[in-house]
Regions:
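Switch/communication elements of ASCE P-loop NTPase nucleotide-binding domains
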Residues: 1-64, 70, 263-412
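Globular "head" domains of long coiled-coil molecular machines
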Residues: 68-69, 125
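A structural detector for beta-sheet-dominated domains
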Residues: 9, 20-22, 67, 76-78, ...
Length: 481
């Protein structure tokens, strides 16, 4: 799906806020100071689409236009007037008609195939928004559905291990190479019966499950080394036996291949088992590339987990027509990964996914936007108690990080640190003073020059724009210009 226009008239500090999306390129980034509503915008969009899914609009006014599955959709919601109108391809649709089509994924719905969310801060706010969907998803699982894929995927750090297992199972090695991961060792999945299991009534292998979960349990049972072993200590329920499946990565890949034929993936299956409280725990060691050293997944850095949750999660979500909402997915990344982030996204999403989906990133990182066009960036700022989201004048691409920092994007007075900049400003004030310097001022100027001489290479080569400015200022004062 492609977002085209959104107007929000009153969600938290988003008062009369409008964004017009003028490019089909991904990602779209939102930058701005703290308090300019970047995270609130992500939440508001999530509220809108959860509301559309259930036919129950959120308690704020909005107007949205987007395209999905070859349809043009426009929705207006007014809390004050009590009006909620939906048009599809210019024709008004009843709420029942729209809701019916949205909930029927096989009918090319006027809705994203999937909404993928990553939120770097406290997750409670996002979890509360999708709480109703989580209940619906659990109901679907309990009713033995064959379709176990989530419409709203909320990826967070706690799921990094499932995503890593999924990447191995489906042979997506590009991100693993970046993370220095060669393979996994000693994979164990600890499972227990669902609450609905009755020992005297249900079969002991599949625990009375049906649909996609039963098929997946059969896949595990057939692939596991020596099938399975009882392991009661992993069970949280003393009256229900647990079991452990031990699966080598070769057999894990075979499970992945079987799931792919059914249009599923291991990540979504593990999510389904966890939702049914069948998956108790997973264990494995990571084999480091090159050295073959083993280490536990808990040893992964926060940045590595963040990459797994976003880039890895998107790699496994093979749907087209998606809405991807990422709130500060770069908080723990080193500069090298931030610099490569746009290409990592391209690596995760197929060309068709990029063409038919919208990815929105809220960020503070100048490196993240350094390779984008101006149409891919919104600058959030406050104006008369309103939040304005406007497009920049120049492309960030080609400017370099130092110039981006001092440009309209971030507006810093200098790309140098504050103390060095203060020394430069003081030197300029003394050097260009019209009156003769006092002995004390001359001594201070010499002291500053000595300090700056030590940093000479840093100033000359890391901030050439400032050096050029300083030389120009000297030339003007000397009458050479």
């Amino acid at each position: 799906m492609k977002l085209e226009y959104i107007h929000i008239a009153g969600y938290k500090n988003l008062i009369d806020t409008t964004l017009v999306f003028e490019t089909s390129e991904n990602p779209i980034t939102i930058i701005g100071n703290n308090g300019t509503g970047k995270s609130n915008l992500i939440e508001a969009l999530l509220h809108v689409f959860v509301g559309l899914y259930y036919g129950k609009p959120p308690e704020f006014d909005y107007h949205i236009r987007y395209a999905a599955h070859n349809k043009q959709i426009e929705v207006r919601n007014s809390v004050h007037d009590g009006s909620y109108t939906v048009t599809v391809d210019g024709m008004p649709w009843s709420h029942a008609q729209f809701n019916r089509r949205v909930r029927s994924p096989q009918q090319m719905p006027p809705f994203p195939s999937q909404v993928f969310i990553y939120y770097s801060g406290t997750c409670d706010r996002v979890e509360n928004i999708v709480k109703k969907y989580n209940r619906s998803y659990l109901y679907k699982l309990k009713n033995q559905s064959d379709d176990l894929e989530r419409q709203f995927v909320f990826s967070d750090i706690s799921q990094a291990e499932w995503i890593l297992l999924g990447l191995i199972a489906h042979r997506h090695h590009a991100l693993l190479i970046d993370l220095g991961i060669d393979d996994l060792h000693g994979v164990k999945l600890m499972l227990q019966p669902p609450e609905s299991y009755v020992r005297d009534r249900d079969d002991p292998i599949y625990w009375g499950t049906e649909g996609g979960i039963r098929e997946f349990l059969a896949d595990l049972h057939n692939a596991a080394d020596e099938n399975y072993e009882p392991f009661a200590k992993y069970s949280g329920r003393s009256n229900r036996e647990a079991r452990v499946y031990r699966i080598g990565t070769v057999k894990l890949e075979k499970v992945g291949a079987v799931l792919e034929k059914r249009g599923a993936n291991l990540y979504s299956m593990l999510q389904a088992l966890a939702a049914r409280q069948i998956l108790v725990k997973n264990e494995f060691d990571i084999i480091q590339k090159g050295s073959r050293n083993h280490y536990r997944p808990e040893s992964l850095s926060e940045g590595e987990k963040q990459l797994l949750c976003v880039i890895g999660g998107l790699t496994l979500a093979q749907n087209t027509e998606c809405l991807v909402l990422l709130d500060e997915p770069d908080t723990h990344l080193n500069p090298a990964w931030s610099w490569r982030y746009n290409n990592l996204l391209k690596q995760a999403l197929t060309s068709q996914q990029r063409t038919t989906s919208t990815t929105i990133i809220a960020t503070h990182d100048p490196i993240m936007i350094s390779g984008l066009t101006k149409e891919q960036v919104f600058i959030a700022r406050k104006e008369n108690e309103r939040l304005i989201y406007e497009s920049p004048v120049r492309d960030p691409r080609g400017q370099g990080v130092a110039n981006i920092l001092v440009s309209e994007y971030f507006g810093l007075p200098s790309s140098l640190d504050e103390n060095t900049q203060m020394l430069l400003d003081e030197r300029l004030q003394l050097a260009y003073k019209k009156e003769r310097l006092t002995d004390e001022e001359s001594a201070r100027l010499s002291e500053i020059n000595n300090q700056l001489d030590i940093l000479g290479l840093s100033i000359s080569f890391r901030d050439p724009a400032y050096k050029e400015f300083e030389e120009q200022k000297f030339a003007v004062l000397e009458g050479r210009v």
